[in-house]
């Protein structure tokens, strides 16, 4: 065994051994428990970042741990390979997106392999592979047959930078999720998936997911947004020119008698009708199209509106109510119209005050009066007043009574509604899965036949950055109609890339199946036992995947209800941000590796300078590693300098996996020093013992010297703790800390006493086993030194020795007059008299007693002694 730890050499040796034996390739074994561990697959952007390293190391630790427990473990890997970044890179570099993507995949695969992940590479897939996306197309056609997929024209979210439609879930704070551009509203035809058909099941089945974070389940429940209310029809005041009745949905029918106006969305047909001869209203409607698109954003933006001059009638009183166009009304929720009750809704209150509209209170607190005039809306349930025949009812009673009368007048009925909207999947871009439809002037929309799938993208196309590239490529869109044989045109929209990631985890189970989308192997491996990824995917990917799985279940393709049994959402990786403001006002960011932090004589930080010019830079504090802030750390540099095991160890030790991790160069150095110390400890042990031998019971536990018995007890306590940390809590940092504490104690074991050598062998073997899921390369090599002729990956997870856990001595708490004054250690089997004698003879206890007479002594065996003075 060499004396020095050379990580690159031993890591290459370990990986070569794993590759030669295909040790991580798995098949179905019915009589063994399976464990499917999956980290969300990456977009092949070109290089791994530290977030990837953290994500995949978490999954690898759990996979290796379960493998040692006897599970049949599958940990696959693939590439979420479609998407706009490839198109944009192709535009900049003048190369086809396919080449850019596959080149990136090759490099990132080599990076993943250099990190030593226990991946079954025979299952690798890329979503841009026609043999993968043919099944997107096949399932889309099945959805079309079932009415789950359909076409409609609707006002959509339009990203002006990427020039494509975005789903509601892809609009964040009014901006595109990828570009950050302010989203516009446009009326465009497209294809939709009826996820709303599954809204009730998607909501109810959250109860089947105890292994998911409550925060994620709450986010999904709120997004689905089930609400109980009443559909109410406001008849038109035809004398005002109102062309139609207005239907609204409200959860607060108890406030109906307080309605003072009705507001409609800018895209509502009534708004468009009213705008015909009102240029100001036309301009206002256009400005609304550039505004916010989500409820949360609308709630906080300035409330703007214009009167239409049209009126509707109150359904119960017949009162004329003005119709306004308001920027806080969403066309996508309910009917695109709201009944406005300023006294009892904050948005309506703000709007009414701004436009001098009446405010009529009709609900007061159950135990008190309402202070009038209102200074803010009273939005709670209460008791009705000023409501004619519906006065003096509780809010629930009033809702029921008003719903009954509306029903009798055929002007309303109780309804359940959802915030969730059907999923628009049409994208006006090239690098995505083609929608398998043909447009024929004679036959209409015709599905591509199953035996003609996949509709393949032209992979040599280089986009020019304007419009939809496929719509400008005759070789792609020109075709003949499969029904009538006349000239026709292929659909040139492609599918939202979230379609690709909505079922990839199922395809991993049967990637070589060419005759079907899936087979029975999926029902062996699924659901995923442990899924790992960022909380930013709580609504988008995770909700879509749950929906897709349920559709596949209903089509008989899989047998499970939920795809992910347990979910771990890892925290972000953070690093310091350094920048300068240029003379033009632009902010220029510098990588922390290019900056020297300065300290004074007492070690206090006083500033930072750029290495290139020795001039000051400002600190922007700690933030998520990102390209835009130039504060990322290249994993490859860490691997080349310290080795993959050091990177893995730091990532697992620096923070619990669900919390943010702050990058620390000193922390990386510390991880490297620990691995060098582990290597040296095994080296010294091997030098002392000559040829290492397997642990044998040369010295029974009870014959160990007392100090070695205590150390062996600590060893087996560490096994218990590390097992619990990995099994139940996933707190890898505390598991590593316990192993480090044990290592510190081992350094005191000296000499050639058989018990000492035996304990050192046992301890080092178990430390290597416990650490092997976290730092597998070094452990692979050290195991061969400790147990020649055996392989670490053939070993089971360590089991604690119950006999070793029995301590010879126990710690007894000592109280004086009921107050804690110290502890004593005493033989476990000591009788009451011995406990009392030891406590009274303790130097610190004697000082606390201060020669006061002892009245009595209370002993609780094995726990405490209370001396009454």
Swiss-Prot record:
A motif ('HIGH' region) lies at residues 42-52. GO terms for molecular function: aminoacyl-tRNA deacylase activity; ATP binding; leucine-tRNA ligase activity. One of its GO terms (cellular component) is cytosol. The keyword Chloroplast does not apply. ATP binds at residue 627. It catalyses: tRNA(Leu) + L-leucine + ATP = L-leucyl-tRNA(Leu) + AMP + diphosphate. GO terms for biological process: leucyl-tRNA aminoacylation. Its EC number is 6.1.1.4. Gene3D superfamilies: 2.20.28.290, 3.10.20.590, HUPs, Isoleucyl-tRNA Synthetase, Domain 1, Valyl/Leucyl/Isoleucyl-tRNA synthetase, editing domain. InterPro entries: aa-tRNA-synth_I_CS, aa-tRNA-synth_Ia, Leu-tRNA-ligase, Leu_tRNA-synth_edit, M/V/L/I-tRNA-synth_anticd-bd, Methionyl/Leucyl_tRNA_Synth, Rossmann-like_a/b/a_fold, tRNAsynth_Ia_anticodon-bd. Pfam families: Anticodon_1, tRNA-synt_1, tRNA-synt_1_2, tRNA-synt_1g. Keywords: Aminoacyl-tRNA synthetase, ATP-binding, Cytoplasm, Ligase, Nucleotide-binding, Protein biosynthesis. It is found in: Cytoplasm. It is an enzyme of class 6 (ligase). A motif ('KMSKS' region) lies at residues 624-628. The keyword NADP does not apply. Belongs to the class-I aminoacyl-tRNA synthetase family. This is Leucine--tRNA ligase. The lineage of its organism: Bacteria, Pseudomonadati, Pseudomonadota, Betaproteobacteria, Nitrosomonadales. The gene is leuS.
């Amino acid at each position: 065994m060499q004396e020095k730890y050379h990580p690159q050499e031993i890591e290459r040796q370990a990986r070569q051994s794993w590759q030669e034996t295909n040790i991580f390739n798995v098949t179905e074994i019915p009589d063994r428990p399976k464990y499917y561990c999956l980290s969300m697959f990456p977009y092949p952007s070109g290089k791994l970042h530290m977030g990837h390293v953290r994500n995949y190391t978490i999954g690898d630790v759990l996979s290796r741990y379960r493998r040692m427990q006897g599970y049949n473990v599958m940990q696959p890997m693939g590439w979420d390979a479609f998407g706009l970044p490839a198109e944009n890179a192709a535009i900049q570099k003048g190369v086809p997106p396919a080449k850019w993507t596959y080149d990136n995949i090759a490099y990132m695969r080599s990076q993943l392999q250099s990190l030593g992940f226990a991946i079954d590479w025979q299952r690798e897939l890329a979503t841009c592979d026609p043999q993968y996306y043919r099944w997107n197309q096949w399932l889309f056609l099945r959805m079309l047959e079932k009415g789950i997929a359909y076409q409609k024209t609707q006002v959509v979210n339009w990203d002006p930078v990427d020039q494509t439609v975005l789903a509601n879930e892809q609009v964040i704070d009014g901006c595109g999720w990828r570009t950050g551009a302010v989203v516009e509203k446009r009326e465009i035809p497209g294809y939709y998936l009826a996820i709303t058909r599954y809204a009730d099941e998607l909501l109810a089945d959250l109860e089947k997911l105890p292994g998911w974070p409550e925060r994620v389940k709450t986010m999904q429940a709120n997004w689905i947004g089930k609400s109980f209310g009443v559909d109410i029809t406001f008849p038109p005041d035809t004398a005002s020119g109102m062309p139609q009745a207005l239907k609204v949905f409200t959860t607060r029918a108890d406030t109906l008698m307080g309605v003072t106006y009705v507001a409609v969305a800018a895209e509502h047909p009534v708004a468009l009708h009213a705008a015909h001869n009102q240029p100001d209203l036309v301009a206002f409607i256009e400005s609304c199209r550039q505004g916010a698109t989500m409820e949360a954003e609308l709630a906080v933006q300035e409330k703007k509106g214009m009167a239409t001059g049209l009126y509707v009638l109150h359904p119960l009183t017949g009162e004329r109510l003005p119709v306004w166009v308001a920027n806080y009304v969403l066309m996508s929720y309910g009917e695109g119209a709201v009944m406005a009750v300023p006294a009892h809704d904050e948005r309506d209150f703000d709007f009414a005050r701004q436009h001098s509209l009446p405010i009529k209170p009709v609900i007061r607190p159950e135990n008190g009066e309402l202070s009038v005039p209102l200074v803010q809306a009273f939005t709670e349930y209460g008791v009705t007043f000023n409501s004619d025949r519906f006065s003096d009812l509780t809010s629930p009673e009033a809702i029921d009574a008003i719903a009954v009368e509306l029903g009798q007048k055929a002007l309303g009925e109780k309804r359940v509604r959802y915030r969730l909207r059907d999923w628009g999947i049409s994208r006006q871009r090239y690098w995505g899965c083609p929608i398998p439809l043909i447009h024929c002037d004679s036959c209409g929309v015709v599905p591509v036949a199953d035996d003609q799938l996949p509709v393949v993208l032209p992979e040599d196309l280089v986009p020019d950055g304007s419009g939809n590239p496929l719509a400008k490529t005759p070789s792609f869109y020109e075709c003949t109609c499969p029904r009538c044989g006349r000239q026709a045109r292929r659909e040139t929209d492609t599918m939202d890339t979230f379609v690709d990631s909505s079922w990839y985890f199922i395809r991993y189970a049967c990637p070589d199946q060419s005759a079907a989308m899936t087979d029975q192997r999926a029902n062996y491996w699924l659901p995923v036992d442990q899924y790992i990824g960022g909380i930013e995917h709580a609504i988008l990917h995770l909700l879509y995947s749950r929906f897709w799985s349920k559709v596949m279940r209903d089509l008989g393709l899989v047998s499970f209800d939920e795809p992910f049994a347990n979910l771990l959402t890892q925290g972000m990786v953070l690093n310091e941000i350094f920048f300068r403001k240029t003379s033009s006002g632009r902010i220029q960011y510098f990588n922390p590796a290019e900056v020297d932090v300065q300290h004074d004589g007492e070690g206090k930080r006083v500033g930072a300078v750029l290495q290139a010019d020795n001039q000051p830079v400002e600190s922007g504090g700690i933030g998520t590693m990102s390209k835009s802030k130039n504060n990322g750390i290249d994993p490859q540099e860490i691997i080349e300098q310290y080795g993959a095991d050091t990177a893995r160890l730091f990532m697992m030790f620096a923070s619990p996996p669900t919390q943010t991790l702050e990058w620390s160069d000193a922390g990386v150095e510390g991880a490297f020093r620990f691995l060098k110390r582990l290597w040296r400890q095994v080296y010294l042990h091997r030098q002392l013992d000559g040829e290492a031998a397997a642990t044998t019971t040369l010295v029974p536990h009870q014959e160990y010297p007392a100090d070695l018995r205590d150390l062996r007890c600590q060893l087996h306590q560490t096994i218990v703790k590390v097992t619990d940390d990995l099994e139940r809590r996933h707190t890898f940092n505390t598991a590593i800390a316990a192993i480090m504490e044990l290592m510190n104690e081992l350094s005191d074991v000296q000499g050639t006493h058989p018990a000492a050598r035996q304990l050192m062998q046992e301890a080092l073997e178990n430390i290597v086993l416990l650490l092997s899921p976290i730092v597998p390369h070094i452990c692979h090599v050290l195991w061969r030194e400790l147990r020649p002729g055996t392989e670490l990956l053939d070993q089971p997870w360590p089991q604690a020795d119950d006999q070793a856990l029995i301590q010879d001595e126990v710690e007894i708490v000592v109280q004086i007059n009921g107050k804690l004054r110290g502890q004593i250690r005493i033989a476990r089997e000591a009788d009451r008299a011995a406990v009392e004698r030891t406590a009274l003879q303790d130097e610190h206890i004697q000082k606390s007693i201060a020669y006061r007479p002892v009245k009595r002594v209370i002993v609780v065996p094995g726990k405490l002694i209370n001396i009454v003075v």
